[in-house]
C-alpha cells in the first residue's frame, strides 16, 4: 500500500488509524514467520502513536505530513527504549537510551513505528543471511535472498508488511535489496540525512535512506528526515527542497549518461542488461537524451570499497569488547582472555573477516600499500563522476549484475557475494545520491532494478526521472504472491 492509498483509507472514515495499524500487525503475524523481515515489533508504541493521530482527526486539527503512515526501522538505527541489535549476538540485549535523529523526525512527522527489521550482522553483507535472528526470505521467491544488508527493510515493503522502511546504505545496502525485492530504494547524498543514532559500519560511507513502494513515497520520507543536525558534524547545512514539487516535471532534453563500463562487464547477466537497456529506450521515448559516457575507474570501486570499508569497520567495532559495550563472555580468568572470548563469541564469521581485513590493511608497513592507495583511487573515482556530470545530468546503470540468488549460494564464497555490490559501491565512494527502481522481471519472475545516480544534492533530479519512468512503465503494479 502506497501513502496515498493509506491516506484515502484514513480519510474515508471507515476505520481509525489505530484499527488500520492493527491490520498491519495481523498481516505481520500471518506472513512474517515465512519472510522473517522483523526482529521485533513495537505494538504498544504504535498504538500510542495511532491514538494521537486519531485524536487530531477527531478534533479536526491539522495533521503532520506522515500522519498514520506505518514505518519500519532497520535494526542498526537507534530507537529509544527498544532493542537495537544490529542482528548480532554482540548487541542482542542493547536497549537504546536515545532516539536517532532520523526516527525522531519521522515520529514528529506523524509516522507510526511498527518495529525493527532484520539485516546482515552489523550491516556487513549482501543477502541478510548472517543475522543472529536467521535469514530473511525474498517475498518473490522464499527460497531466495532479499539482498542485503537492508534485506528485512526491503522484504517488509515488498510483502506489504509496512508502507515504508528505513535502511542504511554503505555500499549498496538500500539499493541492492530494493532491486532484488522489486521496490524503490534511495541512498541520499552523503550528509543530506543525519547519521546520529546509526550504529556505524564505515563512517565515511554510511548513509540512511528510505525503501518504499513508489518514488513519490520515497520523496516524502526523504523530505521529512533530511536537514542539518548539530549532533552530526558530517550532516550538511543546506536547505532541504520540497522533493515532491519536481516529480512530474518533463524530462524532455534531460541528458542521461549510460556508463559503458557497467554494461560491458562480464559479470552482468544478459536478462538484466536487456531489461535495463529496454528501460533506456523508454526514457528516450519520453524525451530524454541518451549519451554514452566513460567512467574508467568505475569497476575499480569494488576493490577500493573492500579496503576502505573494512578499515573503518575495524576501528568502529573496536569498542565492543565486553567491558563497556556489547556481549560479555563468562568464566574468564583475566581481562585479555575475556575481551578475546567476548569478541570471538559475539561477532559472526563475516564481521570477524572484515575486522581482520581492516586491521591488516591499517597495520604498520601495509597502510600505504592498501588503505592510502585505496583512498587515492577513491579520489579518482570521484573525478570520473565529476567529468561525467560535466556532460550529462543523470547517470544510469543496472542496480545489480543479477537478480536475487538462492539462499546458501554464496554464503561460503565471500568474493562472489561481494560482487553483488559491483554497481552500487561507486556512488558511496563518491558520496553521491542514487536510487534503484524496478524496471522489469527475468524469466523466473524475479524483479530487475535500474539505478540512477545524481550529482551532489541533486536528489530532486533522480527522483524526477525515476517518477516519470515509474508512471510510464507501470512495473510496480505487479506484486509478489505469498502463501500463508
UniProtKB/Swiss-Prot annotation:
EC top class named in words: ligase
Organism domain of life: Bacteria
Example GO biological process: translation
Keyword Mitochondrion carried by entry: no
Enzyme Commission number(s): 6.3.5.7
GO molecular function, one term: ATP binding
InterPro entries per the UniProt record, alphabetical: Amidase, Amidase_CS, Amidase_dom, AS_sf, GatA
Entry keyword annotation includes NADP: no
Signal sequence bounds: none
Catalytic residues as annotated in Swiss-Prot or TrEMBL: 74 (charge relay system), 149 (charge relay system), 173 (acyl-ester intermediate)
One GO term describing the cellular component: glutamyl-tRNA(Gln) amidotransferase complex
SUPFAM superfamilies (UniProt xref): Amidase signature (AS) enzymes
Keywords: ATP-binding, Ligase, Nucleotide-binding, Protein biosynthesis
Known catalytic reactions: L-glutamyl-tRNA(Gln) + L-glutamine + ATP + H2O = L-glutaminyl-tRNA(Gln) + L-glutamate + ADP + phosphate + H(+)
Family: Belongs to the amidase family. GatA subfamily.
Entry-linked NCBIfam families: gatA
Oligomeric form and interacting partners: Heterotrimer of A, B and C subunits.
Protein name (Swiss-Prot/TrEMBL): Glutamyl-tRNA(Gln) amidotransferase subunit A
Protein source organism: Prochlorococcus marinus (strain MIT 9515)
Amino acid at each position: 500500500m502506497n501513502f496515498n492509498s493509506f491516506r484515502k483509507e484514513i480519510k474515508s472514515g471507515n476505520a481509525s488509524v489505530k484499527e488500520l495499524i492493527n491490520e498491519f500487525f495481523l498481516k505481520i503475524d500471518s506472513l512474517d514467520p515465512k519472510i522473517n523481515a522483523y526482529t521485533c515489533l513495537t505494538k504498544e508504541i504504535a498504538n500510542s502513536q495511532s491514538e494521537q493521530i486519531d485524536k487530531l482527526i477527531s478534533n479536526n486539527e491539522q495533521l503532520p505530513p506522515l500522519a498514520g503512515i506505518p514505518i519500519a526501522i532497520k535494526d542498526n538505527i537507534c530507537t529509544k527504549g527498544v532493542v537495537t541489535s544490529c542482528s548480532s549476538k554482540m548487541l542482542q540485549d542493547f536497549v537504546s537510551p536515545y532516539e536517532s535523529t532520523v526516527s525522531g523526525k519521522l515520529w514528529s512527522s506523524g509516522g507510526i513505528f511498527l518495529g525493527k527489521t532484520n539485516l546482515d550482522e552489523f550491516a556487513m553483507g549482501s543477502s541478510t543471511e548472517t543475522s543472529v535472528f536467521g535469514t530473511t526470505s525474498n517475498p518473490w521467491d522464499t527460497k531466495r535472498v532479499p539482498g542485503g544488508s537492508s534485506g528485512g527493510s526491503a522484504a517488509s515493503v515488498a510483502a506489504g508488511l509496512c508502507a515504508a522502511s528505513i535502511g542504511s546504505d554503505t555500499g549498496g545496502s538500500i539499493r541492492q535489496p530494493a532491486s532484488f525485492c522489486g521496490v524503490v530504494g534511495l541512498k541520499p547524498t552523503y550528509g543530506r540525512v543525519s547519521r546520529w543514532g546509526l550504529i556505524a559500519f564505515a563512517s565515511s560511507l554510511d548513509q540512511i535512506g528510505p525503501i518504499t513502494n513508489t518514488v513519490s513515497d520515497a520523496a516524502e520520507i526523504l523530505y521529512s528526515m533530511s536537514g542539518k543536525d548539530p549532533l552530526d558534524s558530517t550532516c550538511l547545512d543546506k536547505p532541504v527542497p520540497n522533493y515532491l514539487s519536481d516529480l512530474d516535471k518533463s524530462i524532455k532534453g534531460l541528458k542521461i549518461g549510460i556508463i559503458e563500463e557497467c554494461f560491458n562487464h562480464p559479470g552482468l547477466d544478459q536478462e538484466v542488461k536487456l531489461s535495463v537497456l529496454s528501460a533506456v529506450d523508454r526514457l528516450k521515448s519520453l524525451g530524454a537524451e541518451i549519451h554514452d559516457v566513460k567512467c574508467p575507474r568505475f569497476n575499480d570501486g569494488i576493490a577500493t570499497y573492500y579496503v576502505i570499508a573494512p578499515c573503518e569497520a575495524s576501528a568502529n567495532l573496536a569498542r565492543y569488547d565486553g567491558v563497556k559495550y556489547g556481549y560479555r563472555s563468562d568464566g574468564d580468568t583475566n581481562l585479555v582472555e575475556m575481551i578475546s572470548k567476548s569478541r570471538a563469541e559475539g561477532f559472526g564469521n563475516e564481521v570477524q573477516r572484515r575486522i581482520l581485513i581492516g586491521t591488516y590493511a591499517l597495520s604498520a608497513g601495509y597502510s600505504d600499500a592498501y588503505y592510502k592507495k585505496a583512498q587515492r583511487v577513491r579520489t579518482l573515482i570521484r573525478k570520473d563522476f565529476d567529468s561525467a556530470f560535466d556532460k550529462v545530468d543523470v547517470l544510469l546503470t543496472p542496480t545489480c549484475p543479477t537478480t536475487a540468488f538462492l539462499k546458501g549460494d554464496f554464503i561460503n564464497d565471500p568474493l562472489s557475494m561481494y560482487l553483488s555490490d559491483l554497481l552500487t559501491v561507486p556512488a558511496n565512494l563518491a558520496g553521491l545520491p542514487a536510487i534503484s527502481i524496478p524496471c522489469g522481471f527475468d524469466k523466473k519472475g524475479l524483479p530487475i532494478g535500474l539505478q540512477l545516480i545524481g550529482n551532489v544534492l541533486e536528489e530532486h533530479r533522480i527522483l524526477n526521472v525515476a517518477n516519470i519512468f515509474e508512471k510510464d512503465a507501470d512495473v510496480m503494479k505487479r506484486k509478489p504472491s505469498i502463501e500463508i
